[in-house]
A protein has these predicted regions:
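An amphipathic alpha-helical interaction surface
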Residues: 20, 38, 42-150
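Membrane-proximal alpha-helical anchors
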Residues: 1-42, 47-50
Length: 150
């Protein structure tokens, strides 16, 4: 077992409650993920986004494979080592789960989950927000070819 995986870079959450102005008025930028690791090269792929919208006590969960544009007006923006999920908030609040996969330089694949729940006030601003982050989990280890015995 290769324990160097534990030193891998991972993503942290930046909770941003910025409402974009102008053309995109009313879209709240929330959340943002950032690489805070040790600089090891890795690539990130947001695999799945689940949006559970609270609409008058009816829970609607929609899962989309990212990157995506859908009826909620959601999209992803990458800036350097940050990935922003731009989510158009429902007037009732709701819950969003991002399933993020990343791959290290040795092609091991890790998965990390970020869950957000939020309430939106009458001015369409986030009035309360809570989030959970799971530790990166190894989901696929590079297959080592052990045929060559010398």
């Amino acid at each position: 077992m290769n324990y160097s995986a534990l030193k891998l870079p991972y993503l942290e959450l930046l909770v941003s409650k910025t409402t974009l102005k102008g053309e995109n008025e009313g879209i709240t930028v929330f959340p943002c993920l950032r690489n805070i690791g040790n600089g090891t090269a890795f690539k990130v792929c947001i695999k799945k986004v689940c949006i559970k919208e609270v609409t008058e006590k009816i829970y609607d969960e929609v899962c989309i494979t990212a990157p995506f544009q859908n009826e909620y007006g959601n999209s992803f923006v990458e800036r350097g080592n940050e990935i922003q999920a731009i989510l158009r908030m429902s007037s009732f609040g709701g819950r969003v789960t991002l399933v993020v996969q990343f791959e290290d330089i040795e092609e091991n694949v890790y998965e990390q989950r970020f869950g957000f729940s939020f309430d939106v006030n009458i001015s369409n601003e986030i009035s309360a927000a809570d989030y959970t982050v799971t530790s990166p989990k190894l989901i696929k280890q590079k297959e080592i070819n052990e045929d060559s015995e010398s």
